[in-house]
Amino acid sequence: MDLFYIVLCGILGTSAMSFAMWFITKEGIANADMIRAIGSVITDDNSAFSTGLIIHYIVGIIVAFVYLLFISLFQPQSLWAYTGIGAMIGLFHGVAFAFLLVVVIAEHHPKESYRNAGLEVALAHLGGHVVYGLVVGLVAGIFAIRIIF
């Protein structure tokens, strides 16, 4: 498998998820500003966005490899199968992350503005992870990406 396709899946999936989270925040549905939340764990508010963006994309590329491993286990035969499997992995990942976000991460965040993570924030992250999985699955299906075991 070519590393290029893993990176492509990660970048496009992370971009789609970031856009979805930005849209949710912009529309006032929930405070889903994940990029600044990630960055503000490490640095001050002035550079939180750029730090969070770099971390988010690096993790997104690494997680894309894991998604592609799981997608390959199912040996999908069509674009719909790739996309559906990606979305299901995103759903499971989103449920796990939303739970951790509400129970653990928000409680210990250094910034007060990110400590209030209720149902809306959890659902926003769940949706963001489903979008990520959809896009990773779609790109994997377009290029018929498989990790051979």
How should these model regions be labeled?
Residues 1-149:
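Juxtamembrane/disordered regions of integral membrane proteins
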